Regions:
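Amphipathic alpha-helical coiled-coil segments
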Residues: 1-81, 88-99
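Terminal intrinsically disordered/low-complexity segments used for targeting and assembly
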Residues: 98-106
Length: 106
């Protein structure tokens, strides 16, 4: 009986340790993806302002239309990167929820 109880206690302790490790790992991943999304969000705002300024310069005759197109392309690429970063953040959030015991099926 004592051997069975000790084995059960050991199995329980290992399960708890594994669960805590999963939570720690997914929390690190979620925090990284959140920070990356915030960084890309700032970058996107900068590209949006750059595109707006290029358009203003073009309307004022100070630059060619190629600069407008280039800055718009950079802005749109950044928007795409932001959408991908947001998707990764949400995916990592779901993984964290599941690691914490949430019943989200796959």
């Amino acid at each position: 009986m004592k051997v069975e109880r000790d084995a059960a206690e050991l199995a329980y302790a290992q399960a708890v340790q594994h669960a805590l490790g999963d939570v720690a790992d997914t929390l690190v991943g979620y925090n990284k993806s959140r920070a990356y999304r915030a960084e890309v969000e700032e970058e996107t705002a900068t590209y949006a302002e750059t595109a707006r300024l290029a358009n203003d310069r073009y309307r004022g005759g100070a630059t060619g239309f190629l600069e407008v197109l280039t800055t718009q392309q950079q802005y749109l690429n950044s928007e795409l990167q932001l959408a991908q970063a947001g998707s990764a953040e949400l995916r990592d959030y779901v993984q964290l929820y599941r690691a914490l015991g949430g019943g989200w099926g796959t």
